[in-house]
Amino acid sequence: MKAQSISRRTLLKGASALAVTGALSSLSCAQTGGSSAGAGALPARGEFIIRGATILSMDAAVGDFARGDVHVRDGAIVAVAKEVAAPSAIVIDAVGMICMPGFIDTHWHLWTSMLRPMLSTDDVNRGYFQVTNALGRFFTPRDHYASVRLGLAEALSAGATTVHNWAHNIATSDHADAELRAMRDMGLRGRFSYGPVQGAPNDQPMDLAGLAKIKQQWMPNDDMLTLGIASRNVGDSTNLLRGNISVDMAHKDWGGARALGLPITMHTSGQSPIMLLEKAGLLGPDVQLVHPLLTTAAERDILKARGVSYSTSPVGESQRPASAGVIQLAELLESGVKASMSIDLTGTYNVDFFQCMRFLYSLHRHRVGARVPLTAKRLVQLATLDGAVDLGIAQRTGSLTPGKRADMILVRTGDINMAPMADPYEALVNLAQPRNVDTVIADGRVLQRAGRFTALDHAEVLREAIEAGNALRARAG
């Protein structure tokens, strides 16, 4: 069944039992908070000390502490030590918790978050690509805002402090503006990668005028948000639903982005395009590729030489058939290619960075074994500091380093699935779950405390997403 032939009845099958009232009621019990986060509604930055935590700094110069303190003032990390004296600071008791950098996602299609009720893993006609391709062109700016907020709310609850919003369904600059407003209003750090709307003609360049308009309106800002482009595939690809452009068109799109000083990201599903991109002179340190599944040793040498980074989405990639390739984390690490970790989507699975690390560890041991060492600490680095390196923001975040911005989380170690704890890195990779995330701090703002949002109205976020989804299905017919 072609994507375009999906009917409203097909999409609504199984989704009509959404039970709006019940969903709102049960989820509100799990997360409660104050008024909806919006411009000016975020918690204030201040001065506080994380006291008595097990500190994993991800900075060799700072080191780790079995028990230590982190001093934060006006959104910046002031000190990390065994003991910090700051009489005027508010104390956050973190005894029995791990304090670590927040997770950094490097590739996530947030606009698809509200499509969960319409997706199915058992019905091919309601698969992710079929549904998103069929409905993408019907999205309004309001839909984008609601869907991005829904995805970011789950990201926040799971311990993310930075998300790369891979927005490959931008019809107009108004649609882009809506997604950026959602990102700003949620208070997380992130990159917004502007990509053509679903079904955009392959023989036409992306909307570079709209991209320039968004850059003028949003950049520079307070360094919480950066901008890039999400490119259509270049050359042959198994995923024809996401666009396949020629090298000449890639030069137009990528050249337009580079003229604006913006980085580029692109999927590499199917036949590897790396040699084609290299021959065309398109690769560089401003390029991020996604899904490292079918690269060769020669291609990886090129990527290292050009400074290209690669994002792996372990949960989604592990669901692909063997013919699509395998996650090549070991090969990337062995070749010295920059790598990072990402969620990809939440339509058919949940946000769980701990699970992502476990998947990578298990697949690595199964396929590679001890030939290429991979420790729990290295995986935590992949999920934090390496993501900052990939997104070009390591000077601001990714580690608990004095002078960097205070993007950090507290993970409870006394919960039944975590205790008793020995090695904190192994506990994070092998045992932890999103429900163990106690506190989330982004740019010095405490966005979650004791497992509850501090300013976000969870019920309102969910209600808006449900209403937008219902209206979308009605418009699609």
Language model features by range: what are they?
Residues 312, 319-328, 337:
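A conserved active-site cap/scaffold subdomain adjacent to cofactor or substrate pockets
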Residues 1-68, 73-76, 381-477:
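Active-site microenvironment of metallo-dependent hydrolases
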Residues 40, 174-300:
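Metal-coordinating catalytic core of metallo-dependent amide/deamination hydrolases
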Residues 114-144, 237-240, 271-286, 302-310, ...:
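Active-site gating loops and adjacent loop-to-helix segments of metal-dependent hydrolytic enzymes
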Residues 116-188, 212-221, 466-468, 474:
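Alpha-helical scaffold segments that flank or form the walls of functional sites
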Residues 330-415, 431-433:
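His/Asp/Glu-enriched, well-ordered alpha-helical/loop segment
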Residues 53, 70, 75, 96, ...:
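Divalent metal-coordination and catalytic microenvironments
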